[in-house]
Amino acid sequence: MLIIDGKKVSLELKDELKASVDRYRETTGKVPGLTVIIVGEDPASQVYVRNKAKTCKEIGMNSSVITMPADTPEEHLLDTIASLNLDPAVHGILVQQPLPEQIDEFAVTLAIDPQKDVDGFHPENLGRLVMGHLDKCFVSCTPYGILELLGRYGIETSGKHCVVVGRSNIVGKPMANLMLQKLKRSNCTVTICHSATQDIASYTRQADILIAAIGRAKFITPDMVKEGAVVIDVGINRIDDPTTKSGTRLVGDVDYEGVSALASAMTPVPGGVGPMTIAMLLKNTLHSFERTHNL
């Protein structure tokens, strides 16, 4: 079985991004800039934001983090976003989720300039994706990263049956739309399964490419996968494991040990899709910089 190594590919991408940033610094005197806003003290969000800032520094991008208390009024957050929209040194704006309950996440998404929406969540970017205008939009980072992995590993997709398990706005819906596009790395027949789908296994067993993004540990078992399928595991779930020092370990939405005996190619957890998300966020930020400066 081929292991689709997202960590390895993300490092290759970072080297490519760094080379582009260095070139633009020399030719224009400017570099891309990413600003991340975090509201509250969610530990997982703080770790993720630190990783983004660290990666920006490694490739030479400017990055800043705006930290706000959990009781921040929505109006204050929206005013901050409005200022960043007008800042020519900021090419990407990301508001870390989850947000406190007093803040409307959709209002925040709408407030971000679509040209700086490097998370790809704004309705304008999603609409352009659905209509096939990928050169004029930002694609959500996790689906974008999966497409990059499929391309770099030479996975044949055109005409294949892709089954996406999960319909979130962050992964499931954009992933399905991306795999529908007339692109070399997609062009699939697509089926979406979700919590109300009856007999999910009857669909997943038909998949040439199975993408699991349902948020349930080891949900996809060997009896749900046909031999030779390509399996992409988006899930990150922490389960109890008394054999580890922490007492827990990370697993995906797929039973890796069982399914890997059937799959022709598969992403591990950790080290598969996860590392690609930040890399694609920075690739989107670079694209925003290039569009801004007509490069």
From Swiss-Prot:
Chain positions recorded as NADP(+) binding sites: G166, R167, S168, S195, I236
A Pfam family of this chain: THF_DHG_CYH
Alphabetized UniProt keyword annotations: Amino-acid biosynthesis, Histidine biosynthesis, Hydrolase, Methionine biosynthesis, Multifunctional enzyme, NADP, One-carbon metabolism, Oxidoreductase, Purine biosynthesis
GO (cellular component) term, any one: cytosol
Single Gene Ontology BP annotation: purine nucleotide biosynthetic process
Reactions performed catalytically: (6R)-5,10-methylene-5,6,7,8-tetrahydrofolate + NADP(+) = (6R)-5,10-methenyltetrahydrofolate + NADPH; (6R)-5,10-methenyltetrahydrofolate + H2O = (6R)-10-formyltetrahydrofolate + H(+)
Pathway: One-carbon metabolism; tetrahydrofolate interconversion
Catalytic activity, EC: 1.5.1.5, 3.5.4.9
Protein origin, superkingdom: Bacteria
Molecular function terms, GO-annotated: methenyltetrahydrofolate cyclohydrolase activity; methylenetetrahydrofolate dehydrogenase (NADP+) activity
Recorded family membership: Belongs to the tetrahydrofolate dehydrogenase/cyclohydrolase family.
Subunit-level organization: Homodimer.
Role of this protein: Catalyzes the oxidation of 5,10-methylenetetrahydrofolate to 5,10-methenyltetrahydrofolate and then the hydrolysis of 5,10-methenyltetrahydrofolate to 10-formyltetrahydrofolate.
Protein name: Bifunctional protein FolD
Gene source species: Chlorobium phaeovibrioides (strain DSM 265 / 1930) (Prosthecochloris vibrioformis (strain DSM 265))
